[in-house]
């Protein structure tokens, strides 16, 4: 091949060509008789020298010659400018509002250790890095509003951080990031918050919805009874009996204020409802524990007064053991802040039509795909329902408990919540953690949020 043919080749292409030629030469050499090989090597050894006078060993000869030839041809290539490390010349503090479907992720928060599924923040950081909006997630003043667990979704999650800024050519952040993010994570707005803003501590209230159906195999929930019980959550209470204790945070104040608590109908035709809950802040697994108790009350396994009993820590000082409601129906629906004006993806007059259409089509595709799957599952349910009607329902002596997401838990005999075994007290759990870690009281930074 003439040397001019190599002029447009990249470094990787040249190396690949070298290896290809070397392989062919070795193959041809191996096919020669031993005496012929020895003769050729002797001739080559006597004739070929490197510029510095060092002999080329026969076993390396083919590679050296081909490499030398390729490098000579490559000398005619235009010299490329060295790539400079990417640096942020100017940054701006931005808050991003975004939505995500949680069932494909191992929760919101980025994890240093490997996880079975990716995390939402992991995907967001990947997009930010690919877009050259940040250089290092650990040095961009990052904060999140509400940490959601594996399987939990969000429609109004908020993060804040420093990102690249350009005055000469404004960056359309929503469009840039949504092009790089998975279809089930969408940036829905951004804002330039006031000084001192923190996505977590500046949040005034958080809004959750927990979806469920009224009917389930073997029973139906009493919605009026659940609404009556939900109203008992209103106000400020000690919710230590409605959460999972996280000893690493050394929380001592379990008081939280609930602003709104009710059961609402989402779709009368399908019997879909939601536990609609708003509060200033929430404890770990608090909403799922509150929902679990509402399920028991809706099934008439417990009285509505159970909520008052569990909120009275003098009467019930430690949490009775009970199962939380399933995680998948839970949604962090919105987060509310003062003095924040969100810029929507469609606020730019030049790009609004294109962005609006692309966003709608992306979300529509997800919705349509799930709708088709729902209908397929519905056909299967019809078959199962036909078999149940044909053979009749079996008489069972066990109790059935609805734990959300269409899941049922059966037990031979239902044990009332207040008659169950209790967990250890908050004080005992916190103290044991300190001893295990070798911490003193002065070393502990308690995380108490109201």
From Swiss-Prot:
Swiss-Prot/TrEMBL catalytic activity: a uridine in tRNA = a pseudouridine in tRNA
Binding site for substrate: 208
CDD domains noted in UniProt: PseudoU_synth_ScPus3
Keyword Nucleus: yes
Principal location: cytoplasm
Enzyme class, first EC level, given as a word: isomerase
Gene Ontology molecular-function annotations: lyase activity; pseudouridine synthase activity; RNA binding; tRNA pseudouridine synthase activity
GO cellular component: cytoplasm; cytosol; nucleus
Keyword annotations: Cytoplasm, Isomerase, Lyase, Nucleus, tRNA processing
Protein's cellular compartments: Cytoplasm; Nucleus
One example of a Gene Ontology biological process annotation: tRNA pseudouridine synthesis
Family named by the database record: Belongs to the tRNA pseudouridine synthase TruA family.
Protein name: Putative tRNA pseudouridine synthase C25B8.05
Originating organism: Schizosaccharomyces pombe (strain 972 / ATCC 24843) (Fission yeast)
